[in-house]
Swiss-Prot record:
GO cellular component: cytosol; extracellular space
Listed GO biological process terms: trehalose catabolic process
Ranges where the record places region Disordered: 303-323
Name of the gene encoding the protein in the UniProt record: Treh
Family note: Belongs to the glycosyl hydrolase 37 family.
Enzyme Commission designation: 3.2.1.28
Glycan-modified residues: N288, N293, N359, N451, N516
Organ and tissue specificity: In the adult brain predominantly expressed in glial cells (at protein level).
Protein name: Trehalase
MF term (GO), any: alpha,alpha-trehalase activity
Catalysed reaction, written as an equation: alpha,alpha-trehalose + H2O = alpha-D-glucose + beta-D-glucose
UniProt binding sites for substrate: R193, W200, D201, N237, R246, S247, Q248, R307, P308, E309, G341, E556
Signal peptide limits: 1-23
Amino acid sequence: MFKLPTISLLLVSWSCLVALSQAKTYSLPDLTTDYNNAIPVDEEEAQDPFASCKIYCEGNLLHTIQTAVPKLFADSKTFVDMKLNNSPDKTLEDFNAMMEAKNQTPSSEDLKQFVDKYFSAPGTELEKWTPTDWKENPSFLDLISDPDLKQWGVELNSIWKDLGRKMKDEVSKNPEYYSIIPVPNPVIVPGGRFIEFYYWDSYWIIRGLLYSQMFDTARGMIENFFSIVNRFGFIPNGGRVYYHGRSQPPLLTGMVKSYVDFTNDDKFAIDALDTLEHEFEFFVNNHNVTVKNHSLCVYRDSSSGPRPESYREDVETGEEFPTDEAKELHYSELKAGAESGMDFSSRWFISPTGTNDGNRSALSTTSIVPVDLNAYLYWNAKLIAEFHSKAGNTKKVTEYETKAEKLLLGIQEVLWNEEAGVWLDYDMINQKPRDYYTPTNLSPLWVKAFNISESEKISASVMAYIERNKLDSFPGGVPNTLSYTGEQWDAPNVWAPMQYILVEGLNNLNTPEAKNMSLKWATRWVKTNFAAFSKDRHMYEKYNADEFGVGGGGGEYEVQTGFGWSNGVIIEWLSKHGRDISIGSGCGCLAGEKRQ
């Protein structure tokens, strides 16, 4: 067991970065405990794991570079992913001298020259890595009957080699020169502009790796997350220090469950229990709210200022607010929306009249109790209890079963809506359910956060909900919402993880109607992905529900290719349904078809 003597200094680092209003603050847990699976880290990083945050997370240098006119970078993320050529202190000292010499009004060219001298291009901290356990012909290919789909499976399996990344040794030796968070093992990254690991993306990436028999790579990625929890007390949104104030949907325990199911390595889960418990407690202690006498959780962030990776965009939307306090609250809502993974969506809009109308100025993420987060936490508690049962820890089994039961009761009494026939997010401002479709309304089905004895009743109400909202009418998959706002997590965009939650959730109901719809939607998703790949040779981050075989759009950046979670979901469904799906079989979708 590795002692973390300097972890309390992390709290000091955090306290220097947190400057939210009283309405938005919450305390951090005690991070002074010993943990299994902790790894030694570079001494300098241990002293101040966020040493580079003075460059990449906040301050006048960040603000000046990111708001330069004309702008220096098309994408705000470019700058905060660059490597420092000097120490943070030296860089700040010389920046301040330059600002003084330019009377605090440097030109865009002055700033460009400064960046060119003091920073190196993004990605220099990483090198391409071919996973050592990659197999040319993994066994899932034998489960695919259609020859075209089988060849596609071969090509998808090869993409893992394209997405492999390994951090250079200098990152762990000099972490203060980088925004990237050092981890001990290589990773599979999402792709495109996302050249580092991301938390919830990794769940579906790891599932795909396991089906590809890449057990060592999958285990290494999970162990990276263990090391991060054991150093920082939680898993940031992604592998950069500028994500320090927020996490993403808590799926680490689910990753461990997936690994154990494939390998039967119960010891791996048992040894990880302290870490998994700590992450669970981080969420329930720091994201909790009380609604109708139930303790449930919301998405929220603990940092101040705009998102560094979208700095210019946040400053621009913040200009709509009249005071610094109002701007800060808006930045908090933006980052809470990012923690949800759905950045951004009308799901998080609360208009003055209590609807989901508006734009980003209406973001109220921290005032919405989300179905998915609470369902995931229920699942975490159940899995932790299961792992303790394997270890023979009967007291801990009872403790976490009790936690799960309390969460389930809250989900049932606050979030289940009898009239809608599904679960609905809850608006704490207007004290009412939010009756707007989003796939997460069905997320309890995926993690079995419902009474199995009521499966028939729930199935009937869910199928009626699908019919009422015409969710089966989209040729390119089921969209994330039915609102066309231009945000990337609204219509017409459709995302692999949300299709997965819908399909696997319906299958878990185990009724003929639900299972048939599950297979129909899985087939449709495989085919629209195949059509897009056949045409463009890309797996996309998101797709267009209104058009068969077309990538998505909208949001703050161009649609990205790669793409980790899209690959993972397709590989899993080719493994599960490859004998049932053929290019010529029906799915309610046709090449070139558009929704009317």
